[in-house]
Amino acid sequence: HPTNAAFANGIFGHCLDYEIQGFPPTHGTSSCLPSALALAEVGKYSGQKIIEAYVLGWEIQGRLRAASFSAANPAFHPPGMFGPLGGAAASAKVLGLDTHQTQMALGIAASRTGGLTANTGTMVKSTHPGNAARMGVEAALLARSGYTASDAILETSRGYADALFDGNMDWDIVIGELGASYRISDPGFDIKRFPAQVYMQNPIEAVLNLRNKYGLTADMVQELVLKTSGRGHSGSLPKTGLDGKFSVEYCAASALLDGEVVIDSFTDYKRFSPAMEQTLNKIKVERDGLDSDPVVATALLRDGRSVSDECGKFTGSAGNPMGHQLRMAKVWDCTSRVLDDSSGTTMVNLVEDMENIGDISTLMSIISQKTV
């Protein structure tokens, strides 16, 4: 069923913390794209329809997030709060719902929001976009069948903005110049080079820069100090490999130890390996509380030298584009686990020509099969 497919793919899309990140962060891809794909596969819709639905879902989700940013409770995880409406908007576009049906879909989705940031670093965090995608599909299907909800759920008393943000929603951001520009282009998004929280990207790249510049290995380093902002966890060692995706210490240790940070860097086996335990003991994090400053990595070497390097705008961030070779390395890190070279190449060619795919099931039939 498309609701189950959207749920599963929403989880898969977020569990590695590898998807692109908008501004402010809200995980629009793992909330909206699975909704659109699930319905389009069943209905045999085109790639162009997927693109339109994805852009629209991203737009609605991003506008709501930006409009309530100053009032958002940090205990709520953004894809759980905004994703169901983004998923509903994307689903409504795929199904071709009319104005009234779309209002109903958004009203239904608004009653299905939720997700707590206390679950960061655990498996349940990834269910927030999964639930968003599933609820988006379900809301649109229910609305199409005549299910009703408030037609003013965003602004009405005891509605979405009132309940979740104490009414503090900037409506100019929500509806101003709607359709004149699109948030997926402006302000755009970051592409993560590494499968970890976005706040880990600068620390990882700073350590890799340092390691490569001076030809370092973990054995050469007595202590590694990272001066960074207050974003991301630190101070306690990750309980699992998955938890390491949100730990400055672990991400830095992984970069120093292996000279790369990939999907396999975050297994439990890797987390509790003797080499990782030894390297983690060398990492020290100093917080400066400033988000805008670059991350500075300084290594005190066993031979007495002290060397430093930094990263302030990681590769893949807006303004520092990721080249094709690095993007493809990221793709193959993901696909090589399930697709052989031939299937993977076919998938890439189809995705790069998405707007000309007549039936999206052509693509889905490839990526849903294990060929290795």
Region locations from a protein language model:
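Short glycine-/small-residue-rich flexible loop motifs, especially phosphate/cofactor-binding loops
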Residues: 37, 65, 89, 172, ...
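Terminal-appendage/accessory-domain detector
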Residues: 1-25, 121-134, 141-372
